[in-house]
């Protein structure tokens, strides 16, 4: 099996780590039939790829076999943001497979994170909708669903192009990432309405970039900080600033 090296996967602070643990738990409550999960947003740069990568890591740490499929064929950020490199001579990805240039086994990469696999885009394309709606998409999604416990699909922003809605046809559930103080209720409602037209079940939203200082009382905030620092001691020592992908 081909391999990918994830060079940058930053440590999370206590609050962020607990948030992803809660997200993973809530997904499990949605039922055993929810195996393929589409992650999208209304706008670009709301943190959907950041959410995908950390959900991948969290679920993998829970001994789930997880694969992340990068379906943002026009403007993928995962490879560059997380310093992901191919190991070996072949650099095939989703775009190559959908175009008939390689086979399914050529694009599923094992990573250096235990229990985590990835399907990269391979190359950016302009005709992304044409590729995603090809007859090769359904067999790929069915195979991934059969071989993995969870399939995470990093889709483009649903409010900008229709690729996310196309991919939703092949997914059991969807998460909408919303950046705090950026998304309007009307815009988010439009995304939910578009996804709901498919058979994909909208599981909920993920609120990202929240500044808890802006609405948490001073006394409660300090108590929360002391509680968090107790558990952070000894394992959280980030060396780089956190990069949030698209």
Over which residues does each language-model region extend?
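P-loop NTP-binding module
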Residues: 1-246
């Amino acid at each position: 099996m081909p391999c990918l090296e994830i060079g940058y996967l930053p440590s999370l602070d206590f609050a962020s780590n607990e948030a992803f643990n809660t997200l993973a738990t809530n997904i499990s409550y949605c039922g055993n039939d929810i195996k393929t999960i589409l992650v999208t947003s209304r706008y670009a740069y709301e943190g959907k790829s950041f959410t995908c990568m950390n959900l991948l890591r969290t679920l993998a740490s829970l001994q789930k076999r997880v694969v992340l499929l990068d379906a943002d064929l026009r403007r993928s950020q995962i490879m560059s943001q997380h310093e992901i490199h191919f190991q070996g001579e072949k650099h095939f990805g989703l775009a190559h497979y959908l175009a008939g240039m390689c086979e399914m086994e050529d694009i599923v990469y094992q990573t250096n994170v235990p229990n985590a696999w990835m399907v990269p885009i391979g190359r950016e394309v302009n005709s992304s909708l044409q590729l995603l709606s090809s007859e090769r998409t359904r067999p790929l999604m069915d195979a991934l669903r059969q071989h993995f416990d969870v399939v995470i699909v990093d889709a483009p922003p649903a409010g900008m192009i229709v690729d996310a809605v196309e991919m939703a046809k092949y997914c059991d559930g969807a998460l909408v990432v919303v950046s705090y103080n950026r998304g309007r209720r009307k815009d988010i409602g439009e995304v939910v309405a578009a996804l709901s037209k498919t058979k994909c079940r909208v599981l909920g939203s993920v609120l990202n970039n929240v500044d808890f200082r802006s609405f948490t009382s001073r006394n409660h905030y300090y108590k929360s900080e002391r509680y968090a620092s107790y558990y952070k001691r000894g394992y959280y020592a980030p060396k780089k600033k956190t990069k949030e992908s698209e």
